[in-house]
Amino acid sequence: MVKNIGVLTSGGDAPGMNAAVRAVVRTALHYDVGVYGIYNGYLGLYRNEIQPMTRRSVADTINRGGTFLGSARFPEFKEEAVREEAIKNLRKHEIDALVVVGGDGSYMGAKKLTEMGFPCIGLPGTIDNDVAGTDYTIGYFTALNTVLDALDRLRDTSSSHKRISVVEIMGRHCGDLTVWSAIGSGAEYAIVPEMPFDEDKFLEQLRDQVGHGKNHAIVCITEKITDVNRLAKRIEQETGLETRATVLGHIQRGGAPTAFDRILASRMGAYAVELLRQGYGGRCVGIQANELVHHDIIDALENMSRPFKDCLLDLAHRLA
């Protein structure tokens, strides 16, 4: 039976991480299991930045964005000697299991610890919604609302000035945030990494629409596909309409989590503790068809893929 649990947040912050940590802490304490907060992710684990948590430690955190535990990039965690030091620090505090909240990079750290014999549970915390084994990640819907708000505002000014707006949206290699926000905002175009981007064909379609009287548009595009400032200049040259590029950037990560993210994170955090009490380790939690599930974390990273819903992209284009 697990006696003490550690919890950390890692990678890019996501709204709802605090709610997940709160659920881990209070569920563990409910079962008289000790719980320790690890500050600044895997870097803090390596540096022994570990403190005991009480119910009061997580009071008034469920509504806060970001992560009060902090996060940090720490690529050195790939080194076995670094992980051995991390496990040594966990043992010093008599912690015998770890809950990690983060994306697939954070899962990789949990996988490595699992392979070294230290039980871990991963919770999907990222606005990108790109983690295998779950329909939705903690923070995704809050980020979606943030993007929608920005697109609505850009629509106002674009229509007023007869302007095209090219909007770069986060997501890394996943186009979910782009597609869902395009549908929700009525954007004319959604360009995602899952589908090849034919720039010339896209410009031809845009020229045709402008030729038929279109005088403003919103173009949503996932980051890293192309230079949006260059694309905006080319659109302006090809269509004759003033075109501006907007990179939403890190504003997408901030803000108070939505009700959905608070509840999802709370369910997942509590479920992680239940799994550890049942003797599970090396698992990652997900939600599928609104039911909590868990998968082998190694299998999730190495063999599971997250299918892209082409039908949603088709819908975005049909409704544009």
Swiss-Prot record:
One of its GO terms (cellular component) is 6-phosphofructokinase complex. Its main location: cytoplasm. Substrate binds at T126, I127, D128, R163, M170, G171, R172, E223, R244, H250, I251, Q252, R253. Transmembrane segments: none annotated. It is found in: Cytoplasm. Its EC number is 2.7.1.11. ADP binds at R22, A23, V24, V25, R26, R155, G186, A187, E188, K214, N215, H216. InterPro entries: ATP_PFK (IPR022953), ATP_PFK_prok-type (IPR012003), PFKA_ATP_prok (IPR012828), Phosphofructokinase_CS (IPR015912), Phosphofructokinase_dom (IPR000023), PKF_sf (IPR035966). Allosterically activated by ADP and other diphosphonucleosides, and allosterically inhibited by phosphoenolpyruvate. Mg(2+) binds at D104. It holds the Pfam family PFK. It catalyses: beta-D-fructose 6-phosphate + ATP = beta-D-fructose 1,6-bisphosphate + ADP + H(+). CDD domains: Bacterial_PFK. Keywords: Allosteric enzyme, ATP-binding, Cytoplasm, Glycolysis, Kinase, Magnesium, Metal-binding, Nucleotide-binding, Transferase. It comes from the Bacteria. One of its GO terms (molecular function) is monosaccharide binding. Catalyzes the phosphorylation of D-fructose 6-phosphate to fructose 1,6-bisphosphate by ATP, the first committing step of glycolysis. Homotetramer. This is ATP-dependent 6-phosphofructokinase. It comes from Teredinibacter turnerae (strain ATCC 39867 / T7901). The lineage of its organism: Bacteria, Pseudomonadati, Pseudomonadota, Gammaproteobacteria, Cellvibrionales. The gene is pfkA.
